[in-house]
Amino acid sequence: MRNLNRIIFINSANIPYADDIYLDGNIHFIGTQGVGKSTILRAILFFYNADTQKLGIPVEKQSYTEYYFPYSNSYIVYEVATENGPFCILSFKSMNRVCYRFIDSPYRKEFFIDEESRTAYSGTDRIRAILDQYDVDYSRIIYTYDEYRNILYGNEAGADMQRYALMESKQYQNIPRTIQNVLLNSKLDAEFIKKTIISSLNEEDTSVDLNTYKAVSYTHLRA
C-alpha cells in the first residue's frame, strides 16, 4: 500500500521546522483562523496536483512559490510509505519555480539540516553531497510539473523512476482533480468518483495495484 505518510516543512511558509505532521490515517485539522490549517492543506494538495494555479490562493496573496519557498534553504519534504519502505520527495525553489528530487530513503533530519549549526543547508548541491555521503540513491532534479505528475502516477516513467510511483495509470488526471475538489470544498458527487476509478482501471496495457489505488482514492479522501 502506497500513501503520503508525512509532510515536513523546513523554513517554509513561516514555519522554521516541523516534522510531525503525519498523514497516515484519518486527519482532522482544528484551530482558529490564521494558525496554518490552509497552509498545510495547500502543501498537501500541491503534492497531488502540482499546479500552482489550482490551490485556492486568492489573487491578492503571495504566490505558492513565493510564500512556501522564501529562502534558498526553504524546503518541503513529502515522505511516502510503500510496501518496500518509505521514500521522500524534496521540493524546493529553483529559477523561480518549484522543482523536485526523489530520494530513496525515509526522511532523516541530518540530510537537510546541519547538526552543529542547526540550520538548513542552503542549496540542493549540499544536500546531494550529504546523500552521497550516506550512500542514498536519488533522482536527477525534476524541473517540470508534468514530469513530476507522470512519475508520481506511473505514467510512462522510466524504469529507474517506477519505484517512486503511487500507482500506475495513464489516465490519472481525474485523481488530483478529485482531491483538489475535496480539499477546496468544491462540488463533488459519487458519479464523478466512480468515473475516476473506472477510467483509471480501464486500461489494457497498464498494471494497477488495486490495494494501492484504494489507499490513495479512498483513504485519503476520507481524511
Residue ranges and their predicted role:
Residues 200-210:
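Short, charge-rich amphipathic alpha-helices with coiled-coil/heptad character
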Residues 215-216:
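Acidic, proline/serine/threonine- and glycine-rich low-complexity intrinsically disordered segments
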Residues 1-112:
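Extreme N-terminal "head/tail" segments of very large remodeling/mechanoenzyme assemblies
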Residues 183-191:
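Structural motif
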